[in-house]
A protein has these predicted regions:
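Terminal, charged accessory segments of proteins
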Residues: 1-177
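Catalytic core segments in nucleotide and nucleic-acid processing enzymes
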Residues: 183
Length: 183
């Protein structure tokens, strides 16, 4: 039996991003594999992040519009001849939840749904995926796991670390090693 409460407390203290008093309702559970344990930790962490709100950022978009929005890209409008259709190519910033951190979390949840975890955990992850409907899926092989965190996204540090462990099929041990999930 692995006490998930103790592991979650350890992670919350290690990352100093979570307040431990929010997790007093946890108990011990039986986990038959590490994927189940990581899925439980990720499930609880994502639920807390959803209460805070998903991280958002400004993403640059370029598309053909009939009304001016943002900056006008005249050279691209001439090349694609959108002016003949009474449209123009505009470049503008959109405040979106489709950030790299959210993409990593969504892709990891989708990967966990294919893993050998219980049906109740899969159902819980599917319910959480509903909040990530506007977020694109990415290939985790090409993710730069050495992200820099600031005050606005430091709450993602533990979640991304858990996603890294899930992707690589690792669990952190107390012995010295080369893998870091926290700077």
């Amino acid at each position: 039996m692995i006490p998930v409460q103790n592991i979650y407390y350890m992670l919350s203290y290690a990352f100093q991003a979570l307040q431990a008093q929010n997790y007093k309702d946890l108990a011990t559970e039986k986990f038959h594999n590490t994927a189940e344990l990581c899925a439980a930790i990720l499930d609880k962490g994502i639920s807390v992040q959803l209460k805070r709100g998903l991280g958002r950022d400004y993403l640059s978009k370029s598309e053909s519009l009939s009304t001016l929005q943002g900056r006008l890209n005249i050279s691209e409008s001439i090349k694609t001849q959108t002016l003949l259709k009474k449209q123009m190519i505009c470049i503008y910033d959109e405040f979106s939840t489709n950030t790299q951190f959210n993409q990593i979390i969504k892709s990891t949840m989708l990967m966990l749904l294919k893993a050998n975890i219980t049906n109740t955990r899969k159902k819980s992850l599917r319910n959480l995926l509903l909040f990530f409907s506007d977020v694109n899926e990415i290939d985790l092989r090409f993710v730069n796991w050495n992200q820099h965190y600031n005050r606005s996204n430091q709450s993602y540090q533990m979640l991304i670390g858990i996603c890294y462990l899930i992707y690589n099929g690792l669990l952190q041990t107390q012995s010295d090693g080369a893998t870091k999930i926290m700077d």
